[in-house]
């Protein structure tokens, strides 16, 4: 039992399958439209003229999106507590599934926000697919290797899982942040291009 163990989540019955589908897939995908309204209408220029910096803008987007997933997940927690009290489940198993849902929601939401910073719909889809592929390619081998070292989901595994969540959440937000620049000098490479390259080579 461990965080980011997707197989554990989707093999734990219909409740966790539905919770994972809603909180890790459907709600985070709403982030694909979040940055577009700021960039296409020029609102980001007004925001950057205030005391807000680029990190504040993208973090606010993520907290809003992730907060909706958390609120939705919390609303169904009484069912989990009821299952635990009647003795049908183990608390560590439920905690691992909950951590997978919340951590996965943060990573997918950050990737969706990063992809939404591109104006073209095809580019958004392509960037999001690249982000998901990089996330799977970067997280899965590290998690499997750490689980193999400790012969299970121990402390090393969970430290690796927390690092993976933090890494890919920050990469998604950095991608969105890179598109909020007011100007780029003619000899500079676009920061978003460098971050896309980072996604390619990150695994």
Regions found by a protein language model. Give the residues of each.
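Hydrophobic alpha-helical transmembrane segments of membrane proteins
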Residues: 1-43, 54-203
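Glycine/proline-centered hinge or cleavage motifs at structural transition points of membrane proteins
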Residues: 50-51
């Amino acid at each position: 039992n461990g965080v980011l163990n997707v197989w554990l989540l989707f093999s734990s019955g219909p409740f966790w399958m539905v919770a994972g589908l809603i909180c890790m897939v459907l709600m985070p995908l709403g982030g694909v439209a979040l940055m577009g309204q700021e960039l296409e209408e020029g609102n980001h220029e007004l925001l950057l003229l205030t005391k807000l910096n680029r990190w504040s803008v993208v973090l606010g987007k993520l907290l809003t999106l992730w907060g909706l997933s958390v609120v939705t997940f919390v609303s169904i927690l009484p069912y989990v507590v009821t299952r635990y009290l009647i003795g049908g489940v183990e608390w560590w198993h439920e905690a691992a599934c909950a951590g997978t849902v919340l951590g996965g929601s943060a990573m997918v939401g950050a990737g969706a926000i990063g992809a939404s910073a591109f104006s073209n719909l095809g580019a958004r889809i392509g960037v999001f697919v690249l982000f998901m592929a990089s996330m799977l390619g970067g997280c899965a081998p590290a998690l499997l290797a750490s689980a193999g070292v400790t012969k299970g989901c121990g402390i090393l595994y969970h430290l690796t899982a927390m690092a993976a969540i933090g890494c890919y959440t920050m990469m998604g937000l950095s991608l969105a942040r890179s598109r909020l620049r007011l100007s780029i000098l003619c000899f500079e490479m676009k920061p978003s291009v460098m971050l896309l390259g980072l996604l390619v080579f990150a695994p």
